[in-house]
Amino acid sequence: MHKKPTVLGAQNALQVLSTVVQETPLQYNKRLSDALSASIFLKREDQQQVRSFKIRGAFNKINALDPKELEKGIVCASAGNHAQGFAFSCNQLKTAGHCQLSPL
């Protein structure tokens, strides 16, 4: 069962992630703005070290695990972007990780 998000949890995640996640810009997109008659900005998460926002969830979760949970290593299954965030997080946190990539 998942825990309901809290303000304190978000504040803790912000503090933890500030050590590994880069602040990325919003970029105005004229073509989409014109097509949709609205001001459209794209959040450039492709500028993260792993080229995706997936680092946020992977790092925050692995960092929150108890050291006993990490002793045997951790496992994930992914089709791509999450695997990059997972591998980066395991490396940064010096934790053994095994990732099963799904075939395309």
Q: Model regions: which residues?
A:
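PLP-dependent amino-acid enzyme catalytic core
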Residues: M1-L104
